């Protein structure tokens, strides 16, 4: 009788173990974490000479995939096409230094993972003496196309008047300031910090906008299981210090990922 009871106990434990294994397998809401990304916004995402995409967002995607025991893969996509690509299922999520905004939330869901501020970036010494948005009047201003920065500048241009040119990537826009073709670029403090580090003495922040922006991971609204898993995972990566380590690695304010 005791032997029979012991066998039943072992059988029960084996079933629990199997059930646990199945649960672990089901913990990953997707089989592979494909993410649409525009690698023109360092240090969030950029491209090596080999063509490999890397940066804060790429490392974060890898960390998420590692916890889920699946692979991650970037899907290179032009910035204006990120949300459309998500909706057409070219990727499972968008992780690309993209703001969480009311307009985008009408099309997809999002999980916030970082906060930051917009800045006006100028040449070292600030030769045009730009101290705020109103000082853009009559200046040559550049920005990355398809961004909320561009949308904001178009509205401001209509009010005060200045030359505005848009470029495919943030790095392209910053380059115009470096070579003297533009007076100022509107970008994010994350990008500005990276560019200033890459070009010591040649660039500086002229103005930091007071309002806070939030970067988010976008997902299809119909993917409720993925949404729940992402919320839990981002919370975990914040609590265990993974995002803080990535912020330090890419010389970003650690407080932005708390």
Mark where each language-model region is:
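A ligand-binding cleft/hinge motif common to bilobed small-molecule-binding domains
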Residues: 81, 97-106, 154-155, 176-211
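Periplasmic-binding protein-like
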Residues: 39, 115-122, 189, 193-235, ...
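Extended ligand-binding regions for polar small-molecule ligands
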Residues: 58-67, 124-127, 134, 139-140, ...
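Short helix-initiation/N-cap motifs at beta->coil->alpha
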Residues: 58, 73-84, 128, 164-179, ...
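Acidic, polar ligand-binding/catalytic clefts
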Residues: 62, 66, 71-135, 203-204, ...
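Immediate post-signal peptide segment of exported/extracytoplasmic ligand-binding proteins
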Residues: 22-52, 128-129, 134-140
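Beta->alpha turn/N-cap motifs
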Residues: 36-41, 75-80, 89-101, 116, ...
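Ligand-binding cleft/hinge of the Venus flytrap
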Residues: 45-47, 61-70, 149-167, 196-200, ...
């Amino acid at each position: 009788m005791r032997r029979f009871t012991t066998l039943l106990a072992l059988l029960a434990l084996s079933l629990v173990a199997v059930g646990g294994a199945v649960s672990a397998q089901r913990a990953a809401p997707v089989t592979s974490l494909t993410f649409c990304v525009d690698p023109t916004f360092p240090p969030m995402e950029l491209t090596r000479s080999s063509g490999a995409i890397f940066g804060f967002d790429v490392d974060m995607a890898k960390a998420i995939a590692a916890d889920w025991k699946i692979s991650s893969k970037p899907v290179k996509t032009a910035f204006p096409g990120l949300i459309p690509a998500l909706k057409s299922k070219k990727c499972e999520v968008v992780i690309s230094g993209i703001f969480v905004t009311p307009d985008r939330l009408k099309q997809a869901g999002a999980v916030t993972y970082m906060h930051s501020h917009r800045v006006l970036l100028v040449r070292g010494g600030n030769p045009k003496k730009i101290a705020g948005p109103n000082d853009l009047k009559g200046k040559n201003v550049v920005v990355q196309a398809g961004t909320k920065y561009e949308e904001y500048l178009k509205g401001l241009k209509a009010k005060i008047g200045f030359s505005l040119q848009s470029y495919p990537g943030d790095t392209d826009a910053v380059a115009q300031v470096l070579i003297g073709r533009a007076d100022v670029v509107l970008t994010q403090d994350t990008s500005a910090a990276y560019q200033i580090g890459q070009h010591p003495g040649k660039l500086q922040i002229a103005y930091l906008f007071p309002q806070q922006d939030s970067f988010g991971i976008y997902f299809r609204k119909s993917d409720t299981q993925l949404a729940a898993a992402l919320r839990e995972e981002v919370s975990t990566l914040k609590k265990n210090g993974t995002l803080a380590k990535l912020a330090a690695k890419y010389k970003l304010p650690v407080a932005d990922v708390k």
